[in-house]
């Protein structure tokens, strides 16, 4: 069994991306219950969670919310690949407690990857 639930993360140099977020990003505070990304909008940031926790929520056709993922301090948060390709998110990412997140514009990250 992989060491991470999302096994792709084992193939990414997370130290590099953490350093990018901390050196290039803006530290933003989000109160509990605030959206990092709202379903139906394009995610503006890729973030490194300095403190706090967030949940990924998708909605069924009747509007019922379903938690499909979680992020905690020391992890990354974004709608991948939607944020990089400027596509509308199918889910919301919502803080479950107050959070401090280093936010890097997803447009800048996409430019650096080309």
Regions from the PLM with identified roles:
Residues 36-41:
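Short phosphate-coordinating micro-motif centered on Lys-Gly-acidic
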Residues 33, 44-57, 73-74:
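Glycine- and acidic-residue-biased ligand/ion/polar-headgroup-sensing regions
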Residues 1-31, 81-82:
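Cyclic nucleotide-binding regulatory module and flanking cytosolic helices
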Residues 57-63:
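Cytochrome P450 core scaffold surrounding the K-helix E-X-X-R motif
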């Amino acid at each position: 069994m992989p060491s991470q639930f999302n096994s792709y993360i084992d193939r990414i140099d997370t130290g590099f991306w953490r350093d990018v977020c901390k050196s290039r990003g803006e530290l933003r505070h989000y109160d509990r219950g605030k959206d990092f990304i709202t379903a139906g909008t394009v995610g503006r940031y890729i973030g490194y969670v300095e403190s706090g926790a967030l949940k990924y929520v998708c909605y069924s056709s009747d509007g019922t919310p379903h938690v499909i993922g979680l992020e905690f301090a020391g992890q990354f948060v974004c709608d991948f690949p939607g944020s990089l390709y400027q596509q509308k998110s199918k889910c919301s990412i919502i803080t479950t407690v107050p959070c401090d997140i280093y936010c890097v514009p997803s447009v800048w990250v996409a430019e650096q990857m080309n």
